[in-house]
Amino acid sequence: MKITNQTTKNAIKAQIMMANFTMAEVVDALSMEYGWSDSLSNFSSKLSRESLRYKEALELAEVLGYEIVWKKKGEN
């Protein structure tokens, strides 16, 4: 599967929805917990530009109740 910025953005938005959050709630939580900007447009632009840093992805996952795990392909 070719990964594009649209699939990345949509994948992250889908995870937000599956965790029963709105984008605004995520932005508020990230602002309170980690000092992110409280601007929804900044967060949305970050997703569109694919400029989310790995540290920010970890913080986003934490707020959503997930963890990011690295595993080799083919492992269960």
What do these predicted regions represent?
Residues 1-25, 29, 67:
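A short, Lys/Arg-rich alpha-helix, primarily the initiator
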Residues 28, 32, 62:
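Alpha-helical residues within the helix-turn-helix
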Residues 33-52:
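Recognition helix of helix-turn-helix/homeodomain-like DNA-binding domains
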Residues 54-69:
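DNA major-groove recognition helix of helix-turn-helix/homeodomain DNA-binding modules
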Residues 71-76:
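Short amphipathic recognition helices of helix-turn-helix/homeodomain-type DNA-binding modules
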